[in-house]
């Protein structure tokens, strides 16, 4: 696995709130964008997150502060019963993120 394609994140209270947003590290997302050549328009891009055999479609968006996953994040968060302090990994492979803990 290429570590440049991996996002490791300790979930914050904000990530687990009912705002349904997962804030992502800007440098990691920009590295993936550069490596893949797939731009992230301001209104976002649909991205698949594969969690074992479950697939979640989420909206990866850019804001003035960085990047976040919006629509779809709440479903994955609730399905995995994620809470603040949990460490998650998102590995970009081909055209999707592979989720792990």
UniProtKB/Swiss-Prot annotation:
GO molecular function, one term: DNA binding
Ranges of the DNA-binding region feature: 7-101
Cysteine disulfide links: none
Keyword Oxidoreductase: no
Presence of keyword Mitochondrion: no
A cellular component term, taken from the record's GO annotations: nucleus
Gene3D superfamilies in alphabetical order: DNA-binding pseudobarrel domain
Main location (coarse class): nucleus
InterPro entries documented for this protein: B3_DNA-bd, B3_domain, DNA-bd_pseudobarrel_sf
UniProt keyword annotations, A-Z: DNA-binding, Nucleus, Transcription, Transcription regulation
Compartment(s) of residence: Nucleus
Name of the protein this chain belongs to: B3 domain-containing protein At1g08985
